[in-house]
């Protein structure tokens, strides 16, 4: 049976979309494979790592019929990458193997039974379906994902909190030193739901989401989240645990406010970061009416000083930050202007977008 017969670029694109979670070698060997299921004239591709399952369906010609098998995902992708994008390729069945043909090339690959592939059992308790544009969720993830913890023993910090309530979707991430919050409007009103998506899920979704038109549909259950977009279905387990009360962390009523160009501040921080200590990455901000001075030094007694002219008439403030935390936030914003709010040199700082309440970034000061 010819399972599919089409151009290299069509097959490769579909395989790459589902194979980001696949490891070349796995303690469960079949999880290094992609499940290929032919039903009529449609071909369905499924991958899993037991935490995440990704599935997509494509029309790739070939014989009409029913067939299923699993084959090494990375091997298949590596072979296809060596062929021209307009090369006609065919995948055929041959007893317990599959044969991939392209031009004068022929590759015979081992398979494992489709019935042995561990499909995720979907939760019966999913809430209502709601949606936002694909690009909106991609932007929200970009605004907060950098603040996720990495391998923190507080496992609930190694991911992003999704909160759906009313007609608002809010995303929050924190590693205990900084916190990023971003929100957008939903298409319908929903009851309050909170889930924590694992770090790996977030990274994979950022890879898959595009700026293309179209929406992403979401559903949450107690132990799973499901996303449907661009012909793909993405099911993931959730992180258990109680996320910190982010509303208590976000400061209110700072008396000192500065609005300045995001790119100018980013460039200043990137320059002064060069001479920070490799270990602590500290920069010192001196803020006074009309001037923001950024300074850094290191163990070799080298020093960098840079200044920005600002429209500011508040208190004189000296405060230290991990420069990486500031650069991360500014690099993941797209707006021209940013607002910095401070109380004094010992309290957390708040970055927002002027006239926009959908993004907030809190960063703790550090002693320098």
Feature-to-residue mapping (PLM):
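Structural preference for solvent-exposed beta-strand-turn elements
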Residues: 1-368
């Amino acid at each position: 049976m010819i399972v599919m017969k089409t151009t290299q670029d069509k097959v490769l694109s579909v395989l790459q979309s589902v194979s980001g979670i696949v490891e070349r070698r796995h303690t469960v060997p079949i999880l290094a494979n992609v499940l290929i299921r032919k039903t009529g004239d449609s071909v369905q591709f499924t991958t899993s790592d037991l935490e995440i399952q990704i599935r997509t369906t494509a029309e790739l010609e070939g014989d009409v019929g029913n067939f299923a098998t699993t084959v090494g995902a990375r091997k298949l992708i590596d072979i296809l990458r060596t062929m021209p994008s307009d090369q006609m390729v065919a995948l055929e069945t041959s007893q317990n193997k599959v044969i991939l043909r392209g031009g004068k090339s022929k590759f015979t690959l081992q398979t494992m039974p489709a019935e042995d592939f561990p499909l995720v059992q979907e939760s019966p308790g999913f809430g209502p379906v709601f949606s936002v544009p694909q690009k909106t969720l991609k932007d929200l993830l970009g605004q907060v994902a950098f603040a996720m913890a990495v391998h923190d023993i507080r496992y609930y910090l190694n991911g992003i909190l999704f909160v759906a309530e009313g007609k608002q979707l809010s995303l929050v991430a924190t590693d205990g030193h900084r916190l990023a919050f971003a929100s957008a409007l939903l298409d319908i009103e929903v009851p309050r739901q909170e889930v924590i998506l694992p770090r790996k899920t977030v990274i994979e979704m950022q890879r898959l989401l595009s700026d293309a038109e179209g929406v992403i549909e979401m559903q949450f259950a107690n132990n799973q989240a499901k996303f449907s977009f661009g012909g793909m279905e993405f099911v993931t387990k959730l992180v258990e645990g109680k996320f910190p009360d982010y509303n208590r962390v976000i400061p209110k009523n700072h008396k000192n406010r500065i609005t300045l160009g995001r790119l100018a501040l980013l460039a200043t921080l990137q320059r002064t970061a060069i001479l920070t200590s490799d270990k602590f990455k500290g920069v010192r901000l001196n803020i006074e009416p009309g001037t923001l001075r950024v300074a850094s030094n290191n163990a070799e007694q080298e020093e960098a000083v840079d200044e920005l002219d600002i429209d500011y008439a508040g208190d004189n403030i000296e405060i230290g930050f991990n420069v990486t935390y500031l650069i991360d936030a500014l690099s993941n914003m797209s707006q021209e202007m940013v607002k910095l709010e401070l109380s004094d040199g010992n309290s957390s700082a708040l970055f927002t977008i002027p006239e926009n309440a959908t993004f907030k970034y809190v960063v703790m000061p550090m002693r320098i």
